[in-house]
């Protein structure tokens, strides 16, 4: 893989992972255009690294919230040991529960993971899924602004958003676009819908990469290209962080429709 290809794929991943336009769909299209997916399936390993780069961007952008959740996790264990329950439940602890419940539907699709990944080679599927993403975003702009946040969102809401996240593993369906839109349909505050979508992505992306890493390393990885890969990862992380900041500002205005026309 050339340096230019690595930078370009890192740029696409950083932009498309967080802006609601589907990173998997765009990577599939760009990889086919560039012809970088050869017999050695090198991009399989590279794709894993790219997702870890954008995952780092989530940690940086939401570190205060994530750190509070980590602390609250251990407080929760302490409360469990001592048989105490704080009233009301701290927001960070509710957020942990919402993320756990939202992650559960992903286990239902583990058995068809390989089939879902194979769809990325079919640009008709990818294109159709991008259209669905656009329709979701267009509709989400036209629903009444909600008021639910980590204080008031129900566990059933989290389960529904989690089911949407599981469906969004289909290449071309934007994970962020789908989960944010469904959150808006359920009455989430737009800021909370964005925050919940990105924080919920952490266990999803980690789990997906752990499952994919074994397969990726099982192929013929060209280790001398790893420095080139790492440059793409750095680009993905920096651009991803900038896109999270941008989407936060867009959420303040509650306007996601512009992305619908792009999709």
Predicted regions: what is each one?
Residues 1-263:
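Multi-pass membrane proteins that catalyze or facilitate reactions on polyprenyl-/lipid-phosphate substrates
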């Amino acid at each position: 893989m050339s340096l230019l290809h690595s930078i370009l794929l890192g740029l696409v991943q950083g932009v498309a992972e967080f802006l609601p336009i589907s990173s998997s769909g765009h990577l599939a299209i760009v990889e086919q255009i560039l012809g970088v997916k050869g017999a050695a399936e090198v991009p399989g390993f590279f794709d894993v690294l790219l997702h870890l780069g954008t995952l780092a961007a989530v940690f940086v952008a939401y570190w205060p919230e994530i750190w509070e959740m980590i602390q609250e996790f251990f407080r929760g264990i302490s409360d469990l040991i001592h048989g105490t329950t704080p009233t009301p439940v701290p927001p960070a602890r509710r957020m942990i529960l919402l993320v756990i419940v939202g992650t559960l539907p992903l286990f239902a699709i583990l058995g068809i993971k390989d089939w879902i990944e194979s769809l990325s080679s079919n640009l008709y599927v990818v294109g159709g899924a991008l259209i669905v993403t656009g329709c979701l975003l267009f509709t989400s702009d036209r629903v009444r602004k909600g008021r639910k946040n980590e204080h008031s969102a129900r566990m059933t809401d989290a389960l529904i958003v989690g089911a949407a996240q599981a469906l969004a593993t289909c290449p071309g369906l934007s994970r962020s676009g789908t989960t944010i839109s469904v959150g808006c349909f359920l009455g989430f505050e737009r800021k909370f819908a964005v925050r919940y979508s990105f924080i919920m992505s952490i266990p999803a992306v980690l789990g997906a990469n752990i499952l994919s890493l074994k397969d990726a390393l099982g192929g013929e990885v060209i280790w001398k290209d790893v420095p080139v890969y790492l440059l793409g990862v750095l680009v993905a992380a920096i651009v991803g962080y900038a896109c999270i900041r941008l989407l936060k500002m867009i959420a303040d205005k509650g306007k996601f429709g512009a992305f619908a026309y792009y999709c």
